[in-house]
Design a protein with these regions (language model features):
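A short beta-strand-turn-helix
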Residues: 1-7
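Aromatic-flanked redox-active Cys/Sec active sites in thiol-based oxidoreductases
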Residues: 9-15
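Thiol-based oxidoreductase modules, predominantly thioredoxin-like and allied folds used
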Residues: 10, 33-52
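Cys/His/Pro-rich metal-binding microdomains
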Residues: 16-19, 72
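Typically the conserved alpha-helix immediately C-terminal to a functionally engaged Cys/Sec
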Residues: 19-32
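Structural micro-motif
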Residues: 55-72
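Non-catalytic, surface beta->alpha helical segment in thiol-disulfide oxidoreductase systems
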Residues: 67-95
Length: 95
């Protein structure tokens, strides 16, 4: 997947909700063969900057905040936020 066509998962190292999403993300990848790139934003200014770059779409999906877990589709520019189901993750990835 090209650099501008990624499925991105913004997470925080100590984020309980992010840890709970890991099995869903792994199941998504196993079932679809699509990779979700995880970017940890609480301890990486570089990754946090990437997240801020997509801030408008993420804030819209997250009720006005840049929270984690958040998922951004670089191809469609769509975001989903929080604890999402496998079905919602698949729909987001398809656009």
């Amino acid at each position: 997947m090209s650099e501008n066509n990624r499925l991105i998962w913004f997470s925080g190292r100590e984020c309980v909700h992010c840890k709970r999403m890991r099995p869903t993300v792994e199941q998504f990848q196993a079932e679809t063969g699509k990779k979700i790139t995880e970017l940890e934003v609480w301890h990486s200014e570089e990754n946090a900057s990437v997240m801020r770059g997509y801030g408008d779409a993420i804030k819209k999906a997250c009720g006005g905040d840049l929270g984690v877990p958040a998922f951004f589709n670089e191809k469609t520019k769509n975001a989903v936020c929080g604890m999402v189901t496998l079905e919602k993750l698949k729909a987001w990835a398809e656009g």
